[in-house]
A protein has these predicted regions:
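Secretory targeting and sorting signals
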Residues: 2-28
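Acidic, Gly/Ser/Thr-rich repeat motifs that build Ca2+-stabilized beta-propeller blades
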Residues: 28-173, 228-244, 248, 296-336, ...
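Surface-exposed loop and turn segments in beta-propeller and other repeat-based domains
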Residues: 79-91, 135-150, 194-219, 265-295
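Acidic/polar, solvent-exposed loop segments in beta-strand-rich repeat domains
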Residues: 172-184, 201, 259
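Loop-centered beta-sheet repeat module
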Residues: 186-192, 205-234
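Short beta-strand-to-coil "C-cap" segments at the C-terminal boundary of structured domains/repeats
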Residues: 192-194, 373-377
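Conserved blade-ending motifs and adjacent loop-strand segments that build the rim/top face
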Residues: 337-358
């Protein structure tokens, strides 16, 4: 079993040594990266925009929580190209929660909760930039015990596999212990190959394929509600914004060279802190960054490492926010260590998600309706 323990992570990649030895950066350890002067340019409004993905021909596809998908072009936001509003519910934290294209734009995927609250991943074929409705098929489902902590983000990694974020099942404090259990998909990042079989194949190098007591789909675990995650399009590193319980928000990091199996600690740990008397797991991979709820907000919204061309001073910085605060902030992460923190001095309102366009430029989605692009000031 290829479980990345703290010691194996050190042996497996030098770049993680700094973060494990020094511990994660936190909001009370300020350091300033290169200051980027930016502005938010509202390019469209939508009804509760909640997620998005870069589409073919320089488009950006926007998901609205109630179940519609619309395409953003230079001419604005078009009419819905997909509508599953009769098949989902927005009770609790449910709804249409994530969208993604595969790496050649041949298939489009949606992540949503159905009317029973079950987390569902569906696939559509795409032809000439258009969804083919009659090709729809369900790839994966996961029952949810409660209405919150659904996760729901989906992304294709640089390896061509589909990564799926699922929360711990909800309520509070992970009452079923799902975060640390390997016999459930809840509280995990999954890694599957939807093109490899029906309904999907398991990549042969997934970390738990040889463990009869673990789900083969699991890539990493110990997560509470990994609402938004992304891959650095420059390096392939994985960054996860995991929403905390009541005290600590965290951003987790793993290098592109990771073999998976990271245990991010929940619910034994909240960030680097024992949760309700918990004991730190021996294989705990601490967050690269954490902040408490007395300062920057109360619900982290993970973002992207900026790789666009419009704002040179922002190049290589991880842009993130917080739903309760809305300020756009940055981290400079080098070899798994935060070497700088910044404040972009702009506010996106109830920032629910970021979208990276095909050109590397970033869009900010405010649940109240705004779709804004981060531009040079």
């Amino acid at each position: 079993v290829k479980v990345r323990t703290r010691s194996s992570a050190i042996l497996g990649t030098i770049c993680l040594v700094g973060s494990l030895a020094l511990g994660p950066a936190s909001a009370d350890e300020p350091a300033a990266p290169k200051k980027a002067a930016v502005a938010l340019t509202e390019v469209a409004t939508a009804q509760n925009p909640i997620a998005g993905a870069a589409g073919p021909d320089d488009t950006v596809w926007i998901a609205e929580r109630a179940g519609t998908v619309r395409v953003l072009t230079g001419q604005g936001l078009g009419q819905p190209v997909l509508d599953i509003s009769a098949e989902t519910t927005t009770d609790g934290e449910r709804g249409l929660l994530g969208v993604a294209f595969d790496n050649d734009f041949a298939h489009f995927y949606i992540s949503y909760t159905n009317l029973e609250g079950t987390s569902t991943i569906d696939e559509f074929a795409v032809q000439d930039g258009a969804i083919q409705p009659d090709t729809r098929r369900t790839v994966l489902t996961q029952t949810q015990p409660y209405e919150n902590h659904n996760g729901g983000d989906i992304k294709f990694g640089p390896d061509g596999y589909l990564y799926i974020a699922l929360g711990d099942g909800g309520a509070g404090g992970d009452p079923h212990g799902n975060g640390q259990k390997l016999d459930t998909l809840l509280g995990k990042i999954l890694r599957i190959d939807p093109a490899g079989a029906e309904p999907y194949a398991i990549p042969s190098d997934n970390p738990f394929v040889d463990d009869p007591n673990a789900k083969d789909e699991i890539w990493s675990y110990g997560l509470r509600n990994p609402w938004r995650f992304s891959f650095d399009s420059g390096t392939g590193d994985l960054l996860i914004g995991d929403v905390g319980q009541s005290d600590w928000e965290e951003i987790d990091w793993s290098p592109a060279s990771s073999e998976g199996g990271e245990n991010y600690g929940w619910a034994s740990m909240e960030g680097t802190h024992p949760f309700r008397g918990g004991t730190e797991p021996a294989n705990h991979v601490p967050p690269v960054f954490e902040y408490d709820r007395n300062g920057l907000g109360c619900s982290v919204t993970g973002g992207y490492v900026y790789r666009g061309d419009a704002i040179p001073d922002l190049q290589g910085q991880y842009v993130y926010s917080d739903y309760c605060d809305g300020t756009l902030r940055t981290l400079k992460i080098e070899n798994g260590t935060v070497t700088g923190q910044g404040d972009l001095a702009v506010n996106g309102g109830e920032v629910i998600s970021f979208v990276q366009g095909g050109d590397g430029e970033l869009y900010v989605l405010g649940l109240g309706g705004s779709i804004s692009r981060i531009d040079a000031a």
